[in-house]
Regions:
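Long, amphipathic alpha-helical surface segments
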Residues: 11, 22-50, 58-64, 70-89, ...
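Sec-dependent N-terminal signal peptides
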Residues: 6-15
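Sec/Tat signal peptide C-region and signal peptidase I cleavage site
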Residues: 17-21
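Short, solvent-exposed, charged loop/turn and helix-capping segments
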Residues: 87, 91-97
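Short N-proximal segments of mature Sec-exported proteins
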Residues: 97-111
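N-terminal secretory signal peptides that target proteins for export/translocation
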Residues: 1-3
Length: 167
């Protein structure tokens, strides 16, 4: 009886791994911008309550007259427009532009590129130097108030796995 149970558990775990591999393959078949949008949608979630964010994490800017009861289609449009604007800031980084765009959607471009308040991140410094060993520096963007947040680390890992340019 125990042997049968072990065999069933083994087969079920194998089926689960196969389904996960198929899902990963399907995700990689999508265009990179759609992969980026799906990752953001998954981890950001839908913002419909109070606060400065609406849709899939769009921050309402001064002068924008948007309400919190927008449709999912409007939320998608805002997401793609935000990604386009951020991508324009990073397009000089070649293959890394989309990865940096998705990161900046969550942390803001100033924390990556630097400005008067922040110095350029180690991640952007390595990319500018042409170094490829950026995984740990990318995953280090998982802190909030100095603490590592597991859900953010999981998000960074997913972003890196699906958007890091394979060379």
């Amino acid at each position: 009886m125990n042997n049968i149970r072990h065999i069933i558990f083994f087969l079920l775990s194998f089926i689960g791994l196969s389904a996960k591999a198929q899902k990963t393959d399907a995700m990689m078949q999508l265009p990179p911008i759609q992969r980026a949008a799906l990752i953001i949608k998954h981890f950001e979630g839908w913002h419909s309550g109070k606060g400065p964010y609406i849709g899939w994490g769009h921050r309402i800017q001064p002068g924008e007259h948007l309400s919190h009861n927008i449709t999912r289609q409007q939320g998608d449009s805002l997401l793609y427009e935000d990604l386009r604007k951020l991508f324009n800031q990073f397009k000089g980084y070649g293959d890394y532009a989309l990865l940096l765009t998705v990161l900046s959607y969550n942390v803001g471009p100033a924390k990556i590129l630097g400005n008067g308040k922040y110095k350029p991140s180690r991640l952007i410094q390595k990319i500018r130097q042409g170094r490829k060993d950026i995984e740990q520096d990318y995953l280090d963007f998982c802190r909030w108030k100095g603490r590592v947040i597991p859900s953010i680390k999981k998000r960074r890992w997913a972003e890196f796995q699906y958007l890091y340019p394979i060379q």
